[in-house]
């Protein structure tokens, strides 16, 4: 009931000018889509500020594409649903949008925005994103069914990850889209038991995009960035929501993709 009352005021059908300017100033976007069976995938697109532009409130142009070996690249076809997140960690600002891919070319993507909304600044760890002038792409991504012990250690030490979810319906209702959101907390806020991750669901905006999607479609895509090395850890997972209190999210990993030195960005801690 609360969401039905608040939603129309905060979830917009187009991006206001301040959000368009914000997204255009970002050196990276977190972006998600789904495969043909509804499995969400999430990754990062990077570029110099201005590589994303918004000619109006309902359209975005991205001058760039995911890396050719990133599953996102093969899935972001015209008509595909997308969710995206623009985030400025040192100010804790973030904005989300979803919609459909209009067109793609060798140079980039054209997107139609169906929904746009701001997001709670809680639990964002303050960092500055900087381009590494000496960056060279790392080894090809390694794929496997489960986590290595080194990856379990990485996850236990993480203070940030991103989760992509999707409504199971592919109809024209803008609420039936793909969503990608930020999850953060102090190192150790994620528990790891074999290939199962556990996260307490902290209070935020109470939009319930993530949990609402997972109740209808338990598939999730996860992304853990290594802010020091620019590596990415992608995971497919199946979710279970434990009502609590506290409400808790269990994510059973079904696939792993570890891409060393995938990004030209490095992050430095910023003053809190």
Task: Explain the meaning of each model-derived region.
Residues 1-272:
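Binding-site signature for planar aromatic cofactors or substrates
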């Amino acid at each position: 009931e609360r969401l039905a009352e608040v939603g129309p005021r905060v979830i917009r059908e187009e991006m206001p000018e301040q959000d368009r300017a914000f997204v255009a100033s970002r050196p990276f976007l977190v972006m998600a889509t789904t495969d043909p069976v509804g499995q969400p995938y999430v990754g990062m697109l990077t570029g110099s500020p201005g590589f994303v532009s918004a000619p109006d409130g309902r359209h975005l142009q991205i001058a760039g594409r995911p890396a050719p070996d990133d599953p996102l690249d093969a899935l972001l076809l015209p008509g595909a649903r997308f969710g995206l997140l623009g985030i400025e960690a040192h100010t804790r600002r973030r904005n989300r949008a979803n919609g459909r891919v209009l067109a793609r070319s060798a140079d980039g993507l054209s997107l139609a925005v169906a929904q746009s909304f701001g997001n709670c600044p809680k639990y964002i760890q303050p960092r500055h994103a900087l381009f590494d002038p000496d960056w060279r792409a790392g080894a090809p991504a390694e794929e496997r069914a489960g986590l290595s012990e080194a990856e379990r250690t990485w996850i236990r030490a993480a203070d940030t990850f991103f989760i992509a979810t999707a409504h199971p319906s592919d109809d024209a209702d803008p609420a039936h889209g793909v969503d990608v959101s930020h999850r953060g907390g102090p190192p150790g806020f994620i528990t790891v038991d074999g290939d199962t991750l556990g996260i307490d669901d902290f209070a935020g905006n109470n939009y319930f995009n993530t949990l609402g999607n997972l109740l209808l479609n338990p598939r999730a895509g996860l992304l853990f960035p290594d802010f020091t090395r620019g590596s990415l850890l992608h995971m497919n997972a199946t979710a279970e929501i434990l009502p609590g209190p506290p409400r808790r999210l269990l994510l059973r990993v079904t696939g792993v993709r570890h891409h060393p030195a995938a990004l030209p960005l490095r992050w430095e801690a910023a003053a809190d």
